[in-house]
Structures are given as structure tokens and as C-alpha cells.
Swiss-Prot record:
This is Movement and silencing protein TGBp1. One of its GO terms (cellular component) is host cell cytoplasm. The lineage of its organism: Viruses, Riboviria, Orthornavirae, Kitrinoviricota, Alsuviricetes. The keyword Acetylation does not apply. It comes from Poplar mosaic virus (isolate ATCC Pv275). Keywords: Host cytoplasm, Host-virus interaction, Inhibition of host innate immune response by virus, RNA-binding, Suppressor of RNA silencing, Transport, Viral immunoevasion, Viral movement protein. It is found in: Host cytoplasm. Belongs to the Tymovirales TGBp1 protein family. Residues 1-117 form the (+)RNA virus helicase ATP-binding domain. GO terms for biological process: symbiont-mediated suppression of host innate immune response; transport of virus in host, cell to cell. Transports viral genome to neighboring plant cells directly through plasmosdesmata, without any budding. The movement protein allows efficient cell to cell propagation, by bypassing the host cell wall barrier. Increases plasmodesma size exclusion limit. Acts as a suppressor of RNA-mediated gene silencing, also known as post-transcriptional gene silencing (PTGS), a mechanism of plant viral defense that limits the accumulation of viral RNAs.
Amino acid sequence: MDVLINKLASCNFSRTRNQVGKPCIINCVPGAGKSTLIRELLNSDSRFRAYTFGEADPKNLSGRRILPASELQNAPQGALIIIDEYTEGSWEPGKICAAFGDPIQSRGPGIVADFVCNKTKRFGSSTCELLNGFGFEIHSEKEDICLVRDFFEVEPEGTVIAFESEVKDILARHFVEFEDICSIRGKTFEEVTFFTASNSIPEHLRADFFQCLTRHKNKLTIACPDATFAPS
């Protein structure tokens, strides 16, 4: 456990309580570097095994990678097991060393955290300012571009994302290729154009909007009615 705690501290994860639970629960924002941290643990200490309910790592020469959760039943006896994207599946706490996740992106319940990180290395301060205006807590030291444009006047750039059925129908009629919400979790794109029929974030859709607004690295364009997107 000391290896894990020291690694979390060195990667700017903040401890929330003195007594760390078992499993150790780590909640973090998109782009906090959790996947990189997990891979570093795997490569530095052979006792660790990692399994994800998100997108698993591709096979590599070393054989040390984040595996799909479907292979959890094959974990070696005595391994220190890490669960990634813990909010997205079922697992037995008694068998787990640590669990990483982002309850803000999930509609399911989160767990009280032992460590947290609200600093993202993925996108920049302009997007963070927008998100914080809606009550999220996230910050960044890099710069990015965050624009709000009219739904029918915008020229899509980069990867197009949409999840509302009426929006997807419009995009399909105009032969615009797009990513749906079911395909974007854990993914990052250089630029994103997010199409929405809303001018704000409905409370019951906070998790979905948060996912769509946090997939980019350099530029986010929000295409919405009347080019207005702000807290209601």
C-alpha cells in the first residue's frame, strides 16, 4: 500500500483522510493522469495487476498493461488488484487494493474518496472556467480554446460529438459523422465540436454533458441554439 500512496502523492493526488480504506478509493477528473499512474505502478512493481471497466490497453511486448475487467477472474493469487473506472461495473471490495474512477462522469453512485485530484492535464483553463460556472470543480495550468457557436451556422472542426436523439437525427440527415456518448468514454481528441439542443446543462444529464465537454485537448466548440450556453 505504501508504494501506491507514495505514487499518488508524487502525482499530485490529495489525501482526504488519515486512515486509508481498503480498497483505497481514488476519485479524479478527466485528464488527471490516472491511466498513466496505473501503468507506472504496473511497470515498477510486479505485484500489481490492473483491470478496467473502460477501454483496456492494447497488447504490448512487456505484457504489463491495463486489462479488461472481464479478465479479473483470472487475476493471480496474491496480486494487488487495481480497478479502473470502478463506477462502471460490479466488483468485490474485499479483493481489491485500489479503485480509480470519476463519479462525476457516471450516473451511478460514487464512493467516499481516500485521494482526489481535480487538476486536468488534458484541456485548458478556458474549458475549466466554463465547467466551473456550472458547479464542477476542475482546474488546469494549460491554455485551450472554448467557443460557443450557433447550432446551424457552425462549421464542425475535429471530432463531432452528440448524444441527444433529436440532435443525432439532424446530424444524420446532413451526413455529419459523429461520436455518440457510448463510444467516447476514456477517449481524447485534439479538437471537438459538441452539438446540443440545450442552452444549459439539465441536472439529470450532468454526467452526459460532462463527458462530452471533456474529450478535447486543444479546442472545444459548443454548437447550440442561438449560440447561448450558460447556467440557467
